[in-house]
Amino acid sequence: MHCPVIELAQQLIRRPSLSPDDAGCQAILIARLQALGFTIETMNIGDTLNFWAWRGKGETLAFAGHTDVVPTGDVTRWNNPPFEPTIRDGMLYGRGAADMKGSLAAMVVAAERFVANYPQHEGRLAFLITSDEEASATNGTVKVVEALMARHERLDYCLVGEPSSTEVVGDVAKNGRRGSITANLTIHGVQGHVAYPHLADNPVHRAMPALNELVATEWDKGNEFFPPTSMQIANVQAGTGSNNVIPGDCFVQFNFRFSTELTDVMIQQKVQALLERHQLRYSIEWKLSGQPFLTSRGKLVDAVVNAVEHYNEIRPQLLTTGGTSDGRFIARMGAQVVELGPVNATIHKVDECVKAADLQLLSRMYQRIMEQLVA
């Protein structure tokens, strides 16, 4: 069976684009978009490839995505080589099938069909594509957004193709995401011999009451759109490896996934007040990965709901759960941002796969969103 969405997805999967290596994926997408009359602007930074493409003028709907994928893990555990796309029992297998080369294929084919039907469409259709989402996300979408904002580029709506669905395509759309901030905390003590604790100051012992309080704290209660803020300790390191040395320092790394009830500044202030209360000698560094964002009901959310209902006869849940995505950068432009993509059950796993029929459905949903917003 000839299906342009599946064929393009297979083309992309064949390219081992381990983040941030694009491995030629964007050249394929650019060629398809240029054939439709899109203007292409590449914005390559270091080892990261990015492009911004647009067609038409006026109110702007952008489709955003990434060509990079995560490592495969042990390839011997895959039923088929991860970069040799295979269809078996109606499922398309391969690294990136769900996250997110399937979405990219669905977007581009949707654009081809849309332009064929509306060659003189009224609004502007755009694409923002990067090869740096899965790894550091430092030279990708965030840098493109900064460049677009610097020149006051218009962006009204953005559909991110992240795999948002859980059971069937379109059952969940993400209309926001929690913020993420990480603390790298070092508690300072005095190294010494375990037999002479009075001559040392054990930073692990010092840290434990403070860490207990951190874990027990209710940071907020969440709200209508977001679950309560969560704090998780990710790494703890101390000691020399010897059983007779009291360590001099204790390193603790912890991360907050926070709702719109808090800001990153409020979190930092609360943590530092807690550490001061416990009279610790410490140093702390913070890394903000993204602020929370929320897209309320409006034209984009309504268009997404309409498209899903039309093609899959279900009403999508609007959720803000999960990790961060590049939507956090795009939201800075004041755009309405929604994520809609395939089922995420196998993303980052061995034998990543997606229903071939889901990608065909997804492409039709994307096309209908285009028709509602920029036709």
Curated annotation (Swiss-Prot):
Q: Which residues form the signal peptide?
A: none
- Pfam families per the UniProt record, alphabetical: M20_dimer, Peptidase_M20
Q: Which UniProt keywords apply?
A: Amino-acid biosynthesis, Cobalt, Diaminopimelate biosynthesis, Hydrolase, Lysine biosynthesis, Metal-binding, Zinc
- Give the pathway: Amino-acid biosynthesis; L-lysine biosynthesis via DAP pathway; LL-2,6-diaminopimelate from (S)-tetrahydrodipicolinate (succinylase route): step 3/3
Query: Which GO biological process annotations does it have?
Result: diaminopimelate biosynthetic process; L-arginine biosynthetic process; lysine biosynthetic process via diaminopimelate
CDD domains per the UniProt record, alphabetical = M20_DapE_proteobac (cd03891)
Which protein family is named in the record? Belongs to the peptidase M20A family. DapE subfamily.
The name of this protein is Succinyl-diaminopimelate desuccinylase
